[in-house]
Regions:
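Generic signature of intrinsically disordered, low-complexity, basic-rich segments
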Residues: 10-14, 251
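C-terminal motif of bacterial Sec signal peptides marking the signal peptidase cleavage site
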Residues: 15-19
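Intrinsically disordered, low-complexity regulatory regions in eukaryotic proteins
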Residues: 21-118, 126-266
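Sec-dependent signal peptide recognition
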Residues: 3-10
Length: 266
């Protein structure tokens, strides 16, 4: 009899717990708010390519909570230039002014749906916002940002901690990236010495890159960049007798660069 009683009690407890879990799953567990993905970190980074044409990237507006949206949400956003100054003064010092973020000129980008982005509840809890950018004239040593802020929404409140952010542009091209340098140096009257060193090749344009040559260490300081780097311009001319060797201009001198499995040999 006791065993039967225990089984009945356990069964009732199981049913009660299952019922509670079901009720919890059917109710919103958090405050449902509209926010920008990346805003909690203040800065959201997106990669964009150097191009002579307009390039497209995206950022995302989304909703928090455990349940799906029950209606469409219209989100109105704006560009807030003050965010850039606020960030620079808070996170950089006067000594780092050359590293300050710079607001991208408005004539170099457009956000067609900035003032009317719709999160369609039938399609999910977020919506991508396209950004069209002209990158050809941008400088690799300048940190460009687009300061965006949610101004108003319909149906749900705006997240107080996730409604504004800086979109930081990370520039790239077909040749930029990390490489392993292999080479040798020869001083007059001495035996050649082999040198190997990992290198980061930075883009400076559509077909141009910059690197610290020889054993020079990489640096973000202007003086080091001026004295320790070379700039390569990769042309469309193929070296005679080869299939994949392109001619490269190095400070008004000509050289060649061989591409093989994403590795360049100078």
């Amino acid at each position: 009899m006791r065993s039967i009683y225990k089984i009945v009690v356990c069964s009732l407890l199981t049913l009660s717990i299952t019922s509670c879990e079901k009720d919890l799953l059917e109710k919103e567990q958090y405050q449902k708010e509209i926010y920008l993905i990346g805003a909690y970190n203040r800065v959201w980074t997106t990669e964009v390519s150097y191009s002579n044409e307009e390039v497209k990237t995206y950022f995302t507006v989304s909703s928090s909570g455990t349940l799906a949206l029950d209606r469409d949400v219209n989100v109105k956003m704006k560009i807030n230039e003050e965010l850039v100054d606020i960030y620079n003064k808070k996170y950089w010092t006067v000594l780092n002014e050359d590293k300050y973020y710079k607001s991208l000129d408005t004539d170099l980008y457009s956000i067609p749906s900035l003032e009317n982005t719709v999160i369609k509840h039938a399609e999910g809890i977020s919506a991508e916002v396209p950004v069209l950018i002209k990158t050809a004239s941008l400088k690799i040593d300048q940190s460009y940002v687009i300061p965006v802020e949610i101004e108003s929404t319909t149906g749900y409140p705006i997240s107080e901690s996730g409604y504004k952010m800086l979109i930081l542009l990370k520039l790239k091209n077909d040749y930029s990236g990390s490489y392993q340098m292999s080479g040798h140096t020869t001083l007059e009257g001495e035996t050649p010495k082999t040198i190997q060193k990992p290198k980061t090749i930075k883009p400076t344009g559509v077909n141009t890159v910059r690197l610290f040559y020889a054993m020079n260490n990489e640096s973000d300081e202007k003086a080091d960049i001026q004295t320790g780097t070379i700039e390569l311009t990769i042309t469309d001319q193929i070296v005679e007798g080869t299939n994949d060797v392109k001619k490269v201009l190095i400070k008004n001198e000509s050289s060649t660069v061989t591409r093989k499995k994403d590795c360049y040999r100078i």
